[in-house]
A protein has these predicted regions:
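Glycine-rich, anion-gripping cofactor-binding loops and their flanking helix/strand elements
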Residues: 64-65, 81, 211-286, 394-421, ...
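Thiamine diphosphate
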Residues: 99, 106-119, 125, 390-531
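Glycine-rich, acidic loop regions that bind phosphate or pyrophosphate groups
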Residues: 89, 100-147, 234-338, 443, ...
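Cofactor-/ligand-binding subdomain signature composed of acidic, glycine-rich
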Residues: 1-18, 143-201
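Phosphate/pyrophosphate-binding active-site segments
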Residues: 1-2, 278-381, 485-489, 495, ...
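Active-site diphosphate/adenylate-binding microenvironment
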Residues: 8-11, 16-19, 26-30, 34-39, ...
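N-terminal cofactor/phosphate-binding cores enriched in small/glycine residues
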Residues: 3-84
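Structural signature of the thiamine diphosphate
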Residues: 22, 66-74, 79-81, 89-96, ...
């Protein structure tokens, strides 16, 4: 009979899936569910040892002999008793997995018996420490990732998995349970082997590469060639050949869902992509990351390739250009059609008389295409960068998407402009601009910095957050409603200033911004209608 606890069953299955078959078991009530299910599974060679200090060293000896071992202890100071063995394993680089049962989080520091702050207790002497606390939403995928992170790190030394559990009396017993057997494979190839390429182009029927925010130093023809053979969803923050896809993803038909996602880079601006792309139950997710981080916004990860984005994409490019058996799939053709429809939809949504943030960005990008000088374009977070993902084509976009805060966007562009002779443009919303106005308080700034300020006198993105329309205090306390303009800021800092309050003034202002010669920065402030 097994205890029916998802965390326990997931841990039991993954220990076996990662090749750990020798487990030292120490007595206790809090860890009884883990001990019972490990023994009951008959997948492990089990060693009962009462003294945790001795048990830790016995686990070390087993690891020295067979390669890997685990030890399971109960809650409280039992965990600290294994510390001497863990320290020794750390400096020997031996693979020892320490599993500690723990009281629920609400019992810690509440004078409940046999409790202490267990999570992090061994941090100085383990390669990875995880805590299987309960979170809102999908606990299983969250716990799966944490356990896999720890067990992958175990290849380089000891790790600690802390498992908060209820009283054993609160968990029922059943005859059979599902033991998780889906590890995350860590692959560190020097080249893209033939079998990997075959799996990408022939094993999967609907392969898709998703590229988040990152710096990829590859020529544009690499991306454009790859797009002929494989569907790529990317944003201009990482790929100058990116195609707009937000409207496609929001109404995505099942035939456009991938069965293999290859995820590269950091966060994506498009919010809906994560849940929608992973909607198909058979979707696998591979991660390409030189640091081998188990990171996936798709709530699933099956394999990690320890390659840089440049190395992986360049080797994929070499594969499609050298092999004659790789041809565009129907999936690629379906997505190409969807891209064309989305581009037309975005174009049709812009009116010549319209003065909106979208029309400003669209006109700016259209005129920028005609410029013959070198340039770099920064977009501030929030509405500005979301518009960039719709209307930018043919150049890279810079944006602080590491944490996605609005602070420092203008200062980042200013710093960029100070270190180059090229033109640097920054498109920003009003809250980002006024929050970071001291970026312009700098006598060393040159005339190569040009700013487009989209001023609708509040955080416009809050108008589109579902649920906030019911908030009676949205305008006053949430969206930062104000009546400020940038004229005074520009005057006091010797910055050129252009005001635009109509569509015609906006278009003339953008032409001036792109062509006027000056030795100081210029700000074009476009006053937009407020909702």
């Amino acid at each position: 009979m097994f205890y029916d606890n998802d965390k326990v069953n997931l841990l039991t299955g993954l220990l076996k899936a990662y090749g750990i078959t020798h487990v030292v078991l120490c007595p206790g009530s809090r860890n009884a569910m883990i001990v019972n299910n490990i023994v009951e599974s008959r997948l492990f060679t089990c060693y009962p040892v009462t003294d945790e200090r001795s048990a830790g060293f016995q686990a070390l000896g087993i690891a020295q002999n067979v390669g890997k071992a685990a030890i399971v202890v109960t809650s409280g100071s039992a965990l600290l008793n294994v510390a001497p063995a863990v320290v020794e394993a750390y400096y020997q680089r031996q693979s020892v997995v320490v599993v500690s049962a723990d009281r629920p989080q609400e019992d810690i520091d509440q004078n409940v018996g046999q409790t202490m702050r267990q999570y992090g207790a061994l941090d100085n002497f383990v390669k990875r420490s995880v805590n299987l606390t309960d979170a809102l939403g999908d606990n299983h995928s969250y716990h799966h990732r944490l356990v896999c992170e720890a067990l992958c790190a175990c290849n380089f030394g000891p790790v600690h998995i802390n498992v908060p559990l209820p009283n054993v009396t609160e968990c029922r017993m059943v005859e059979n349970v599902h033991l998780e057997n889906r590890p995350v494979d860590l692959v560190v190839p020097t080249t893209l082997q033939t079998d990997i390429a075959d799996e990408i182009f022939f094993g999967a029927k609907r392969t898709m590469i998703v590229i988040g925010n990152c710096h990829i130093s590859l020529p544009e023809h690499v991306f454009s060639t790859l797009r002929q053979f494989i569907t790529i969803l990317s944003e201009p923050l990482s790929d100058p050949t990116a195609q707009p896809f937000e409207g496609i993803v929001e109404n995505l038909p099942d035939e456009l869902l991938p069965d293999l996602i290859i995820y590269i880079g950091g966060s994506l601006v498009c919010r809906s992509i994560h849940s929608r792309l992973a909607a198909a139950s058979d979707t696998r997710v591979w991660r390409v990351d030189a640091d081998c981080q188990l990171c996936s916004p798709f709530k699933r990860i099956d394999r990690v390739y320890g390659l840089s984005a440049e190395a992986f994409l360049h080797q994929l490019y070499a594969t499609v250009t050298q092999r004659t058996d790789i041809v565009p799939s129907p999936f690629v053709k379906s997505w190409d059609k969807a891209f064309r429809v989305e581009r037309q939809r975005l174009s049709d949504s812009i009116s010549d008389t319209d003065l909106s943030a979208a029309s400003v960005v669209n006109y700016f990008e259209t005129q920028l295409d005609d410029m013959f000088y070198n340039y770099h374009v920064h977009y501030a977070n929030s509405t500005a960068v979301r518009l960039a993902c719709r209307y930018v084509s043919g150049h890279k976009v810079y944006c602080n998407r590491g944490v996605n805060g609005i602070d420092g966007c203008l200062s980042t562009a200013a710093g960029f402009s100070a270190s180059t002779a090229d033109m640097v443009f920054c498109v920003t919303g009003d809250l980002s601009f006024f929050y970071d106005q001291n970026a312009l308080w700098n006598n060393n700034l040159k005339g190569n910095l040009r700013v487009i300020l989209l001023n609708d006198h509040h955080g416009g993105i809050f108008d589109r957050v579902r649920g906030l329309e019911q908030c009676a205090h949205r305008d006053t306390f949430v969206s930062g409603r104000h009546s400020a303009d940038a004229r005074g800021i520009c005057t006091q800092n010797d910055i050129g200033y252009i005001a635009a309050k109509t569509a015609d003034e906006m278009r003339l202002g953008i032409v001036r911004l792109l062509t006027e010669e000056t030795n100081r920065p210029i700000v074009l402030e476009v006053t937009l209608k407020t909702s």
